[in-house]
């Protein structure tokens, strides 16, 4: 179902009929809470979704069908470490609340692959790095344009695979994706078919992990088959082996690229790295040669970032892959404290001053 047809269907419902249906739905859910597959609550119609979110049908239609004249996102750019800029699309409060509702009521209830360590509870860059400590060789690969590679159709298929109806999967897919186009230097958001996960939505990281379950399963299997360990943190893929497997590295990379391409992603060849134990081995910025450690370069960059934030504010600043800057710097400061207590204490003090000065969150959130 296209966004245009969905909009027409949603508009066709009169307000008085909407009230009647919502009252009926309330009674129905009290008598028989429906279940989709995976133990998830079932939402078969736009009316049921709107009721569950606690918003009107008209509001749901507004959030699901955006055009260049109705912007649901606030775009801003951040600098990449390798040069250039990355567009972050931060959803406005109402859309962000809808995305967070989907995250908390659906996405977080599902299991991801054990190899995935990014954007999930009880896993971090630390748990992602630990399996690779003391490895004989480490191979790092990077997925190019990770979120942009996950299209609306893939997101919709994810929800269909969870047992949701076509109309429901369409609505969830539209709420969780967007299409960015530049007109005269301005970023506009359209209802085109070329939609993808926005980098900035609270639902995007969880969706990416769920979409990547098959990718992770295939890569973990091929890695194990030739004596490698595999983990993934967002778009960073790491393979390591404790034995001398130098003769198998080219075969690993070749087969890995084939799987990645067949799963709809692309390897960024410029970021492929191979490091044996005579070199400094890093996994998502963590040194793992003999124990977990942090490079002086990374510590210096983090100290500079905290200073800039404290002096200039949150706008335009970033740390790591998270779009929640406060959460990112808090997490990294805590991580440093685990390895270097004195430096960590210094960083944590800086973070607390930043929180007192600018607040604990970057944007106000509306929760349904």
Predicted features along the sequence, with ranges:
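Short beta-strand
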Residues: 229-233
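Active-site-proximal polar cores
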Residues: 204
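Right-hand nucleic-acid polymerase module
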Residues: 1-78, 85-87, 91-111, 115-137, ...
């Amino acid at each position: 179902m296209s966004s245009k047809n969905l909009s027409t269907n949603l508009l066709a419902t009169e307000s008085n009929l909407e009230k009647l249906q919502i009252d009926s739905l309330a009674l129905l859910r009290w008598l028989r809470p429906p279940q989709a597959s995976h133990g998830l609550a079932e939402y078969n119609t736009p009316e049921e979704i709107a009721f569950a979110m606690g918003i009107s049908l008209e509001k749901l239609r507004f959030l699901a069908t955006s055009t260049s004249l109705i912007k649901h996102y606030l775009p801003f750019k951040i600098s990449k470490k390798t040069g250039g800029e990355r567009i972050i699309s931060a959803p406005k409060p109402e859309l962000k609340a809808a995305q967070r509702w989907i995250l908390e009521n659906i996405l977080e209830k599902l299991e991801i692959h054990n190899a995935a360590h990014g954007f999930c509870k009880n896993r971090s860059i630390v748990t992602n790095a630990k399996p690779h400590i003391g490895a004989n060789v480490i191979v790092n690969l990077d997925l190019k344009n990770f979120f942009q590679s996950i299209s609306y159709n893939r997101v919709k298929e994810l929800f269909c695979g969870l047992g949701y109806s076509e109309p429901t999967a369409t609505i969830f897919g539209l709420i969780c994706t967007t299409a960015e186009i530049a007109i005269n230097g301005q970023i506009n958001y359209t209802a085109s078919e070329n939609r993808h996960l926005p980098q900035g939505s609270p639902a995007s990281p969880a969706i990416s992990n769920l979409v990547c379950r098959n990718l992770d399963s295939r890569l973990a299997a091929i890695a194990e088959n030739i004596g490698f360990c595999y983990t993934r943190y967002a778009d960073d893929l790491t393979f390591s082996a404790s034995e001398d497997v130098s003769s198998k590295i080219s075969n690993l990379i070749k087969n890995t690229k084939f799987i990645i391409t067949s799963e709809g992603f692309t390897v960024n060849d410029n970021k492929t790295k191979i490091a044996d134990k005579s070199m400094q081995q890093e996994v998502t910025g963590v040194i793992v040669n003999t124990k977990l450690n942090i490079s002086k370069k990374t510590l210096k960059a983090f100290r500079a970032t905290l200073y800039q934030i404290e002096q200039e504010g949150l706008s335009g600043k970033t740390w790591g892959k998270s779009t929640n800057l406060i959460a990112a710097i808090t997490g990294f400061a805590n991580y440093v404290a685990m390895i270097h207590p004195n430096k960590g204490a210094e960083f944590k003090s800086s973070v607390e001053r930043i929180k007192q000065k600018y607040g604990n969150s970057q944007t106000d959130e509306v929760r349904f």
